[in-house]
Amino acid sequence: MSSMTRGRCDPKNGVPTDLVKEYYTQRAGAAFILTESISWTQRGNGFPGSGSLYNSDQAVGWKKVVESIHAKGGKIFI
């Protein structure tokens, strides 16, 4: 599954919401999932609702998404 930004992460902090986890988990049967755009720095965030991965809260949020996909046998790349 190719990447497509959904804008469903928390717009204040970039942490994936339960809706993000549900969205990707529903697609876990795809051969391979490439996530939406992810900012690696606070300054690099292009727009509200996009995902981020530059602090521990965000890492914990993405870990929940990844574990949910792996539980369904899926593969994901952030």
Report the location of each language-model feature.
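Flavin-dependent oxidoreductase catalytic cores
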Residues: S2-F77
